[in-house]
Amino acid sequence: MDYVHSRANPVVKHLIKLATQRRERLRSKQSVLVGTHLIESALDHAFTLQHVFVRDGSSQHNEVATLIERCEAQRIRMTTLSGELFDAIEQMPSHTGILALFEFPHVEDFNATRGAVLIENVQDPGNVGSILRTCAASTVEQVWLSKGCADVWSPKVLRAAMGAHFLLDIIQNVELDALPDVSIAVTSLGDRSKSLYDVKFERDLVLAFGAEGAGASDELLARASHPLHIPMSGRVESLNVAAAAAICIFERERQLLASAE
Protein backbone atom coordinates (compact mmCIF):
# COMPACT_ATOMS: atom_id res chain seq x y z
CA MET A 1 0.00 0.00 0.00
CA ASP A 2 1.39 3.41 -0.98
CA TYR A 3 2.13 5.93 1.78
CA VAL A 4 1.48 9.67 1.36
CA HIS A 5 2.50 12.36 3.85
CA SER A 6 2.70 15.53 1.74
CA ARG A 7 -0.14 18.03 1.48
CA ALA A 8 1.29 18.95 -1.93
CA ASN A 9 0.22 15.57 -3.29
CA PRO A 10 -2.39 16.25 -6.03
CA VAL A 11 -4.71 13.47 -4.85
CA VAL A 12 -4.68 14.89 -1.32
CA LYS A 13 -5.42 18.37 -2.65
CA HIS A 14 -8.36 16.97 -4.60
CA LEU A 15 -9.71 15.10 -1.58
CA ILE A 16 -9.57 18.21 0.61
CA LYS A 17 -11.49 20.15 -2.05
CA LEU A 18 -14.09 17.40 -2.33
CA ALA A 19 -14.56 17.38 1.44
CA THR A 20 -15.06 21.15 1.64
CA GLN A 21 -16.27 22.53 -1.71
CA ARG A 22 -19.61 21.87 -3.40
CA ARG A 23 -18.27 23.28 -6.65
CA GLU A 24 -15.50 20.69 -6.78
CA ARG A 25 -17.95 17.87 -6.13
CA LEU A 26 -20.24 19.03 -8.92
CA ARG A 27 -17.34 19.56 -11.32
CA SER A 28 -15.79 16.15 -10.78
CA LYS A 29 -19.00 14.24 -9.92
CA GLN A 30 -17.05 12.75 -7.02
CA SER A 31 -17.24 12.85 -3.24
CA VAL A 32 -15.75 11.28 -0.13
CA LEU A 33 -17.18 8.58 2.12
CA VAL A 34 -15.89 8.77 5.68
CA GLY A 35 -15.97 5.88 8.12
CA THR A 36 -16.41 2.13 8.19
CA HIS A 37 -20.22 2.11 8.12
CA LEU A 38 -20.58 4.13 4.92
CA ILE A 39 -17.82 2.27 3.12
CA GLU A 40 -19.26 -1.08 4.17
CA SER A 41 -22.72 0.03 2.95
CA ALA A 42 -21.27 1.12 -0.38
CA LEU A 43 -19.58 -2.24 -0.88
CA ASP A 44 -22.69 -4.16 0.22
CA HIS A 45 -24.75 -2.39 -2.45
CA ALA A 46 -22.17 -2.81 -5.23
CA PHE A 47 -21.32 0.91 -5.24
CA THR A 48 -18.01 1.43 -7.03
CA LEU A 49 -15.20 2.88 -4.91
CA GLN A 50 -12.35 4.41 -6.90
CA HIS A 51 -9.72 4.74 -4.19
CA VAL A 52 -9.62 3.94 -0.45
CA PHE A 53 -7.44 5.80 2.05
CA VAL A 54 -6.43 4.49 5.46
CA ARG A 55 -5.10 6.61 8.32
CA ASP A 56 -1.64 5.52 9.36
CA GLY A 57 -2.02 3.00 12.19
CA SER A 58 -5.75 2.38 11.69
CA SER A 59 -5.35 -0.93 9.87
CA GLN A 60 -4.94 -2.61 13.26
CA HIS A 61 -8.63 -1.99 14.05
CA ASN A 62 -10.78 -5.00 13.21
CA GLU A 63 -13.46 -3.13 11.23
CA VAL A 64 -10.86 -1.31 9.14
CA ALA A 65 -8.85 -4.50 8.59
CA THR A 66 -11.97 -6.29 7.35
CA LEU A 67 -12.72 -3.50 4.88
CA ILE A 68 -9.14 -3.50 3.66
CA GLU A 69 -9.49 -7.22 2.88
CA ARG A 70 -12.74 -6.62 0.98
CA CYS A 71 -11.24 -3.76 -1.01
CA GLU A 72 -8.11 -5.74 -1.84
CA ALA A 73 -10.29 -8.63 -3.05
CA GLN A 74 -12.02 -6.19 -5.42
CA ARG A 75 -8.68 -4.73 -6.52
CA ILE A 76 -9.61 -1.26 -5.30
CA ARG A 77 -6.61 1.05 -5.14
CA MET A 78 -5.53 1.74 -1.55
CA THR A 79 -3.23 4.32 0.04
CA THR A 80 -2.09 5.02 3.59
CA LEU A 81 -2.20 8.68 4.66
CA SER A 82 -0.34 10.32 7.52
CA GLY A 83 -2.57 11.22 10.45
CA GLU A 84 -2.27 14.94 9.70
CA LEU A 85 -3.38 14.55 6.08
CA PHE A 86 -6.20 12.17 6.93
CA ASP A 87 -7.57 14.55 9.56
CA ALA A 88 -7.40 17.47 7.10
CA ILE A 89 -9.61 15.54 4.67
CA GLU A 90 -11.95 13.98 7.20
CA GLN A 91 -13.20 17.35 8.61
CA MET A 92 -15.66 15.60 10.98
CA PRO A 93 -13.71 13.19 13.21
CA SER A 94 -15.11 9.66 12.99
CA HIS A 95 -12.20 7.95 14.75
CA THR A 96 -12.47 5.05 12.29
CA GLY A 97 -9.49 5.94 10.13
CA ILE A 98 -10.76 5.04 6.67
CA LEU A 99 -12.30 7.02 3.82
CA ALA A 100 -13.04 6.43 0.15
CA LEU A 101 -13.19 8.40 -3.08
CA PHE A 102 -16.15 7.57 -5.30
CA GLU A 103 -18.02 8.88 -8.33
CA PHE A 104 -21.67 9.48 -7.61
CA PRO A 105 -24.31 8.35 -10.12
CA HIS A 106 -25.98 10.83 -12.43
CA VAL A 107 -29.74 10.24 -12.62
CA GLU A 108 -31.82 12.31 -15.04
CA ASP A 109 -35.13 10.51 -15.56
CA PHE A 110 -37.96 11.47 -13.22
CA ASN A 111 -40.18 8.50 -12.36
CA ALA A 112 -42.93 9.22 -9.87
CA THR A 113 -44.50 5.80 -10.41
CA ARG A 114 -41.68 4.29 -8.36
CA GLY A 115 -42.44 6.58 -5.44
CA ALA A 116 -40.81 10.01 -5.21
CA VAL A 117 -40.12 12.72 -2.65
CA LEU A 118 -39.24 16.33 -3.51
CA ILE A 119 -37.07 18.34 -1.11
CA GLU A 120 -37.10 22.10 -1.71
CA ASN A 121 -34.54 24.49 -0.22
CA VAL A 122 -33.81 22.38 2.87
CA GLN A 123 -30.39 23.69 3.82
CA ASP A 124 -29.40 21.75 6.92
CA PRO A 125 -27.32 18.68 5.95
CA GLY A 126 -28.66 16.73 8.91
CA ASN A 127 -32.25 17.32 7.82
CA VAL A 128 -31.54 16.34 4.21
CA GLY A 129 -29.75 13.19 5.35
CA SER A 130 -32.55 12.27 7.75
CA ILE A 131 -35.18 12.63 5.02
CA LEU A 132 -33.12 10.44 2.70
CA ARG A 133 -32.85 7.79 5.40
CA THR A 134 -36.61 7.85 5.95
CA CYS A 135 -37.16 7.48 2.20
CA ALA A 136 -34.83 4.49 2.11
CA ALA A 137 -36.76 2.89 4.97
CA SER A 138 -39.98 3.18 2.95
CA THR A 139 -40.91 2.22 -0.62
CA VAL A 140 -39.84 5.61 -1.98
CA GLU A 141 -37.24 5.04 -4.70
CA GLN A 142 -36.51 8.53 -6.05
CA VAL A 143 -35.60 11.76 -4.27
CA TRP A 144 -35.57 15.09 -6.11
CA LEU A 145 -33.73 18.05 -4.58
CA SER A 146 -33.97 21.69 -5.61
CA LYS A 147 -30.91 23.87 -6.18
CA GLY A 148 -31.41 25.55 -2.80
CA CYS A 149 -30.86 22.34 -0.82
CA ALA A 150 -27.72 21.32 1.03
CA ASP A 151 -25.43 19.40 -1.31
CA VAL A 152 -26.81 15.88 -1.23
CA TRP A 153 -23.38 14.33 -1.91
CA SER A 154 -21.51 16.31 0.75
CA PRO A 155 -19.78 14.29 3.49
CA LYS A 156 -22.17 15.77 6.09
CA VAL A 157 -25.30 14.64 4.23
CA LEU A 158 -23.73 11.27 3.46
CA ARG A 159 -23.02 10.76 7.14
CA ALA A 160 -26.51 11.81 8.25
CA ALA A 161 -28.16 9.51 5.68
CA MET A 162 -26.26 6.46 6.97
CA GLY A 163 -26.06 4.67 3.61
CA ALA A 164 -29.47 5.72 2.22
CA HIS A 165 -27.77 7.17 -0.88
CA PHE A 166 -26.96 3.65 -2.06
CA LEU A 167 -30.64 2.64 -2.01
CA LEU A 168 -32.18 5.62 -3.83
CA ASP A 169 -32.15 7.30 -7.22
CA ILE A 170 -31.19 10.90 -6.44
CA ILE A 171 -31.74 13.83 -8.78
CA GLN A 172 -30.21 17.10 -7.57
CA ASN A 173 -30.38 20.74 -8.68
CA VAL A 174 -33.97 20.31 -9.84
CA GLU A 175 -35.84 23.30 -11.27
CA LEU A 176 -39.55 23.19 -10.44
CA ASP A 177 -40.54 24.18 -13.97
CA ALA A 178 -38.60 21.17 -15.28
CA LEU A 179 -40.63 18.68 -13.25
CA PRO A 180 -42.88 16.26 -15.13
CA ASP A 181 -46.66 16.63 -14.97
CA VAL A 182 -47.20 14.90 -11.65
CA SER A 183 -49.50 15.26 -8.68
CA ILE A 184 -47.73 16.81 -5.70
CA ALA A 185 -48.70 16.75 -2.03
CA VAL A 186 -46.91 19.48 -0.09
CA THR A 187 -47.02 20.48 3.56
CA SER A 188 -48.80 23.83 3.85
CA LEU A 189 -50.74 25.93 6.35
CA GLY A 190 -52.84 27.60 3.64
CA ASP A 191 -56.64 27.69 3.46
CA ARG A 192 -56.76 24.80 0.95
CA SER A 193 -54.69 22.55 3.19
CA LYS A 194 -56.22 19.20 4.20
CA SER A 195 -55.31 17.00 7.13
CA LEU A 196 -52.63 14.49 6.19
CA TYR A 197 -55.05 11.75 7.23
CA ASP A 198 -57.68 12.93 4.72
CA VAL A 199 -55.32 12.69 1.75
CA LYS A 200 -55.62 9.55 -0.39
CA PHE A 201 -52.12 8.46 -1.35
CA GLU A 202 -51.47 6.76 -4.67
CA ARG A 203 -48.01 5.41 -5.42
CA ASP A 204 -47.29 8.17 -7.96
CA LEU A 205 -48.33 11.06 -5.69
CA VAL A 206 -45.12 12.98 -5.00
CA LEU A 207 -44.59 14.17 -1.42
CA ALA A 208 -42.84 17.55 -1.18
CA PHE A 209 -41.26 19.35 1.76
CA GLY A 210 -40.13 22.97 1.88
CA ALA A 211 -37.40 24.86 3.66
CA GLU A 212 -36.87 25.05 7.39
CA GLY A 213 -38.77 28.06 8.69
CA ALA A 214 -40.03 29.44 5.38
CA GLY A 215 -41.75 26.26 4.22
CA ALA A 216 -42.63 25.57 0.60
CA SER A 217 -42.12 28.33 -1.95
CA ASP A 218 -45.08 30.04 -3.63
CA GLU A 219 -44.07 28.33 -6.87
CA LEU A 220 -44.22 24.89 -5.28
CA LEU A 221 -47.52 25.65 -3.54
CA ALA A 222 -48.97 26.73 -6.88
CA ARG A 223 -47.92 23.37 -8.39
CA ALA A 224 -49.38 21.36 -5.51
CA SER A 225 -52.50 19.31 -6.15
CA HIS A 226 -52.72 18.19 -2.52
CA PRO A 227 -51.73 20.83 0.07
CA LEU A 228 -51.71 19.13 3.46
CA HIS A 229 -50.90 19.67 7.11
CA ILE A 230 -50.14 17.39 10.04
CA PRO A 231 -52.78 17.69 12.78
CA MET A 232 -51.13 18.66 16.07
CA SER A 233 -52.24 19.35 19.63
CA GLY A 234 -51.48 23.06 19.36
CA ARG A 235 -48.88 23.04 22.12
CA VAL A 236 -46.09 23.56 19.57
CA GLU A 237 -46.19 25.72 16.47
CA SER A 238 -44.41 23.44 14.03
CA LEU A 239 -42.31 20.32 13.50
CA ASN A 240 -38.76 19.95 12.26
CA VAL A 241 -38.90 19.27 8.51
CA ALA A 242 -37.25 15.86 8.89
CA ALA A 243 -39.81 14.86 11.54
CA ALA A 244 -42.69 16.11 9.37
CA ALA A 245 -41.31 14.19 6.40
CA ALA A 246 -41.11 10.97 8.41
CA ILE A 247 -44.74 11.29 9.53
CA CYS A 248 -45.99 11.99 6.00
CA ILE A 249 -43.88 9.33 4.30
CA PHE A 250 -45.06 6.64 6.67
CA GLU A 251 -48.70 7.68 6.44
CA ARG A 252 -48.24 7.18 2.70
CA GLU A 253 -46.63 3.83 3.45
CA ARG A 254 -49.48 2.79 5.73
CA GLN A 255 -52.09 3.57 3.09
CA LEU A 256 -50.21 1.79 0.31
CA LEU A 257 -49.77 -1.31 2.46
CA ALA A 258 -53.47 -1.28 3.40
CA SER A 259 -54.57 -0.95 -0.23
CA ALA A 260 -52.35 -3.88 -1.22
CA GLU A 261 -54.05 -6.27 1.21
List each model region and its residues.
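RNA substrate-binding interface of SAM-dependent RNA methyltransferases
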Residues: 70-73, 84, 101-192
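Glycine- and other small-residue-rich loops at beta-strand/loop junctions that grip anionic moieties
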Residues: 4, 31, 120-121, 146-147, ...
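Active-site/ligand-binding-proximal alpha/beta "capping" segment
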Residues: 185-234
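Boundary-proximal intrinsically disordered activation/regulatory segments immediately upstream
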Residues: 1-65, 149-150
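Glycine/small-residue-rich loop that forms an oxyanion/phosphate-binding "nest" at active or ligand-binding sites
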Residues: 68-99
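Amphipathic alpha-helical repeat scaffolds
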Residues: 35, 124-130, 239-244
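Structured adenosyl-cofactor binding patch, chiefly the S-adenosyl-L-methionine
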Residues: 100, 134-138, 149-166, 218-261
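Short, aromatic/basic amphipathic alpha-helical patches
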Residues: 62-74, 156, 219-220
